[in-house]
Amino acid sequence: MLDKVKGRLIVSCQALENEPLHSPFIMGRMAKAAMEGGAVGIRAQGVEDIIEIKKVTGLPVIGIIKRNYEDSDIYITPTKKEVDELLTTGCEMIALDATNRVRPNNEDLKELIKYIKENGVLVMADISNYDEAIKAQEYGVDCVSTTLSGYTPYTKTLEGPDFVLMERLVKDLEIPVIAEGKVNTPQDLKKVFELGVHSSVVGSAITRPQLITEKFVKAIEIN
């Protein structure tokens, strides 16, 4: 899968229960549209969505399950329970929160990564800073993604992608770096590839029409 997505675009097709497009059928069609536009991989949330997307597109899928737990702020594939659910989908890669925060039930990140790999599936570490990426590489993940930069209490929220972090990771890591998080424009995408990232995930800017519409409405209101 990593060879297939090198230098190409991955599109995130997700709609949570409180969002207008929440439906495996709709996400399957969204992924098909992304494929027709040139995407070579899909990041998707939830067992039903992943199965539908794989059936409709045949593209490799990075699978996640978002689930909230009372004893942790981690919600992207937080525990072994979500991993086991994802292993039933046939997704080629599982992404999980690899930040320094405490996992639900105090589960161990290193053991989760080992478990996924023992089941023959690639692992993407969603990180928020440099140290987390280094640790994830030591734990044996196949790639790191900058998904959570700006989304942890100890990282700075930026308007756009964390170019500084990406550049540093590309320079220092031996595994592929995937750009993800606030890649909002084709110009952003071009820049992250110029920094040397392996691939990039774009989500909201392509597949969340309520947010896209909101940007246009705000432009009117400003004037």
UniProtKB/Swiss-Prot annotation:
- What keywords are annotated for this sequence in UniProt? Carbohydrate metabolism, Isomerase
Q: Which GO terms describe its molecular function?
A: N-acylglucosamine-6-phosphate 2-epimerase activity
Is Isomerase among the key words of this record? yes
Q: Name one GO cellular component term.
A: cytosol
Q: In which pathway does it act?
A: Amino-sugar metabolism; N-acetylneuraminate degradation; D-fructose 6-phosphate from N-acetylneuraminate: step 3/5
An example Pfam family from this entry, by short name, is: NanE
What EC number(s) has UniProt assigned to this enzyme? 5.1.3.9
GO biological process: what's one of them? Answer: carbohydrate metabolic process
Enzyme class at the top of the EC tree: isomerase
**Gene3D superfamilies linked:** Aldolase class I
What is catalyzed by this enzyme? an N-acyl-D-glucosamine 6-phosphate = an N-acyl-D-mannosamine 6-phosphate
The similarity comment for this entry is: Belongs to the NanE family.
- This protein's name: Putative N-acetylmannosamine-6-phosphate 2-epimerase
Q: Which organism is it from?
A: Clostridioides difficile (strain 630) (Peptoclostridium difficile)
